[in-house]
Amino acid sequence: MEKSRMNLPKGPDTLCFDKDEFMKEDFDVDHFVSDCRKRVQLEELRDDLELYYKLLKTAMVELINKDYADFVNLSTNLVGMDKALNQLSVPLGQLREEVLSLRSSVSEGIRAVDERMSKQEDIRKKKMCVLRLIQVIRSVEKIEKILNSQSSKETSALEASSPLLTGQILERIATEFNQLQFHAVQSKGMPLLDKVRPRIAGITAMLQQSLEGLLLEGLQTSDVDIIRHCLRTYATIDKTRDAEALVGQVLVKPYIDEVIIEQFVESHPNGLQVMYNKLLEFVPHHCRLLREVTGGAISSEKGNTVPGYDFLVNSVWPQIVQGLEEKLPSLFNPGNPDAFHEKYTISMDFVRRLERQCGSQASVKRLRAHPAYHSFNKKWNLPVYFQIRFREIAGSLEAALTDVLEDAPAESPYCLLASHRTWSSLRRCWSDEMFLPLLVHRLWRLTLQILARYSVFVNELSLRPISNESPKEIKKPLVTGSKEPSITQGNTEDQGSGPSETKPVVSISRTQLVYVVADLDKLQEQLPELLEIIKPKLEMIGFKNFSSISAALEDSQSSFSACVPSLSSKIIQDLSDSCFGFLKSALEVPRLYRRTNKEVPTTASSYVDSALKPLFQLQSGHKDKLKQAIIQQWLEGTLSESTHKYYETVSDVLNSVKKMEESLKRLKQARKTTPANPVGPSGGMSDDDKIRLQLALDVEYLGEQIQKLGLQASDIKSFSALAELVAAAKDQATAEQP
């Protein structure tokens, strides 16, 4: 605070620092210097500091000179100060004593007032207790007087035949009884109240007995006035729940016992539905008057209704639930999932229809909040039902995802049973015969598990070696392989009996690989259809975030798409190996023409047709299962790879022929014989030229067949180079003819 009040002298504007920096609480020399160095050199900073230091010294001298007289007179002004202070001590002590005395007097006065106020409050409370007890006695005597007078009048036939009068008297008693109850609660613990309590208990018992009898009489005679007076009386004494319980026991329970019969439900084909229909008839037929009086019916007049009652929620519904739980326990048994699903669906439909009989939305909310409602829902063991369904689906799927790949049923759009079973499992999860709204989260998780399991299965297939057996033979288990990961996770058993036991790998045929790719493509096409099946089910429970569902299915599509390249590569490699297995027969062409006197070739070799036969079979045999683009991709890849190897083979053959030809020429020249004559003994084409011509015919025929496959020869890698190679050889062969 002192620093903030000090005014430092102002320095020149040329200073490289702010003078107020020195007065800050967090002033730091190092920070100050480093900050100034950013603007000026150290020499300039030093000069500015020295300049300001001189200004400070000058200002300090001026300040001392200005107040010099006050500094000198300071000791003089303090002379006699001790004496003056001593003179003040005596009167201050007297003042202190007077203040303490006054404080004591005031405290005593306050204490006396508090004591009197406390006594008055105690007297007031006791007076209120006495008044309440007096009121209790008066109410008891008044009620007893009314009851006595009513008893004396019961001899009169006129009064006895007037239930309305009885209802009015009960209302008067109830009003007085209500006040009696209020004052009795306020007077709890008073000795006099204990003496009066037996009389109060007698009044209570008689009042409840009269009300029950009157209510039953009104229900039996369908007298709206009696029912109205009786229910109003129950409401007055805050016993509405007793009235609802009475209706449940006397009116509802006998009907429930007659309707809910287990033998009828099990023997009748639609026994459960018939039973629920009869239960739904109870409210409109037997509770009409009660609902009109209490405002539970649409036609009720507001002025004549007695609020505070809900007989459907508090009387009918608890008795229905109790009857179902006690007399029909098999209803909730999940052992038979199909029967359980049917019973659950019919029961939930019954609950929805019962809710529509509620008089208002508030009544529906009360019904859903009722303990019996929660008890009824908990009785349905949905987790056990789902577990049974889960095992059914998982077991069926795992039975198809085995080492032995079986064909799908004839009517299926899929080729393999594994794919057919996967799609049928997905559809079954959301079928009307299995789906339950409360299990939607479990069913969605099972859907993703099925898709993931199929993706793992396909990845495993892509790792299998390709066998040379036909598709019919490959259906038989070639070897016993290890089991794949199961959708049930943890139910597989250890198949190995020891560390020395080997597990051979299961092979797969090329046709089966083609089927896998076709099924993958088909399944990806049908996943949007699955989304359309799922949407209505999710809308049923109010779910709106369909983008997340769609994204999850797109992820599954991506995982399926990621499997295709490896499968395609495997198929292309196998086709290429098969194709080149025949194309390498070009190595046998020299043996066919050398020293055999065969005619000049005019047609292509048969090995070309043999090499292309698998490709034509692929195109014709699977065009209804695969997209043409996929087939074309495989054909192009197969031909590109095999043609490249074929090019190398033909090149080697032509080079070998050329070397043989040159070697023979050199040999003949060395023997000084007749110069080598390229023509044959009969003056025709030489064996070497026949070889060249045959290879040219083979390659030309190969190009023609490629076009028949729907491909352009220019799209096949190495084919252009191969065509140029044999064209040059053909030109050489024809050029040497005479």
From Swiss-Prot:
GO terms for biological process: glycosylation; Golgi organization; intra-Golgi vesicle-mediated transport; protein transport; retrograde transport, vesicle recycling within Golgi. Keywords: Congenital disorder of glycosylation, Disease variant, Golgi apparatus, Membrane, Protein transport, Transport. It is found in: Golgi apparatus membrane. It comes from the Eukaryota. Residues 483-500 have a biased composition (Polar residues). InterPro entries: COG2, COG_complex_COG2_C, COG_su2_N. Its main location: Golgi. It is a peripheral membrane protein. The keyword Amino-acid biosynthesis does not apply. One of its GO terms (molecular function) is protein-containing complex binding. Pfam families: COG2_C (PF12022), COG2_N (PF06148). Residues 474-504, 668-687 are annotated as: Disordered. The keyword Transport applies. One of its GO terms (cellular component) is Golgi stack. Required for normal Golgi morphology and function. Belongs to the COG2 family. It is linked to Congenital disorder of glycosylation 2Q: A form of congenital disorder of glycosylation, a genetically heterogeneous group of autosomal recessive, multisystem disorders caused by a defect in glycoprotein biosynthesis and characterized by under-glycosylated serum glycoproteins. Congenital disorders of glycosylation result in a wide variety of clinical features, such as defects in the nervous system development, psychomotor retardation, dysmorphic features, hypotonia, coagulation disorders, and immunodeficiency. Component of the conserved oligomeric Golgi complex which is composed of eight different subunits and is required for normal Golgi morphology and localization. This is Conserved oligomeric Golgi complex subunit 2.
